[in-house]
């Protein structure tokens, strides 16, 4: 299995180095739900600004404040403790009056707004995230500038970031140990982390192998293609290849890669054979996903940061702004720009 730091770069390995997250203010994330609260219902959606607090801890403190069980507080995604983040939490409070959230006290945390909502906010139920990042101590401004222009046009690999695999790859190692034993894992969080790490590692490996091909973005017979911004996909046939290629080139369609698991992978013929060969050596992780009945799915091979802009503060410091759809990683953008000093795994999704 190829480690995250050695996965194929779309624009070649960066020439220079830089520092990501010298302080929390260098990594700002704002959740984009993609909808507005209903204004009524048994749930309360809260938009919270936090710095120095992890999401689960804030959710637990909020549950105590509302005098409800911790399981009644949900969120769409984990956000980094060591960053400035705006995210939405959801509390189920049936039959209760609207609390006075001005009395909610937690250092580094502030309730910005709140409203009633009819439905629980579930994991992954957001449109995307807006990022403002500051990269410091950049050793090669010219190379970074060239790469930013290339990313604006050509995107980046849609890799799962190193943080998906845990500090030192602990989640992936946990998955491997679990796969090689028959012992049940009763901790639901561990199960989730380990299975996600296993499937994400296999996806990364498939993309890594495809990007080695000079014609990686050429549609082949049996490719699973996805309408940009949509979750469903369809299979390319040889008769349609010229027209489908035109739509891929215009970024109307995206070539996808497998999130392996049980059931059909989605590709057929030549494309399926390529994906199977790309992870043929990873039998242990594949067996785990089959054993635990994790359903196979698809994910776009490339990621195109939206609203990408940048501003050089000086020759060694640049501020980046961009928006990514839910499930995509800012660190996968940064790795195409600089060889980062620091550990990606400390940056939450």
Curated annotation (Swiss-Prot):
InterPro entries noted in UniProt: PsdUridine_synth_cat_dom_sf, PsdUridine_synth_TruD, PsdUridine_synth_TruD_CS, PsdUridine_synth_TruD_insert, TruD_catalytic, TruD_insert_sf, TruD_pseudoU_synthase
EC number per UniProt: 5.4.99.27
Classification of source organism: Bacteria, Pseudomonadati, Pseudomonadota, Gammaproteobacteria, Enterobacterales
Annotated ranges, domain TRUD: 155-303
PANTHER family given in the database record: TRNA PSEUDOURIDINE SYNTHASE D
Function: Responsible for synthesis of pseudouridine from uracil-13 in transfer RNAs.
Protein's UniProt name: tRNA pseudouridine synthase D
GO molecular-function terms, A-Z: RNA binding; tRNA pseudouridine(13) synthase activity
Pfam families found in the cross-reference section: TruD
Catalysed transformations (reactions): uridine(13) in tRNA = pseudouridine(13) in tRNA
Origin: domain of life: Bacteria
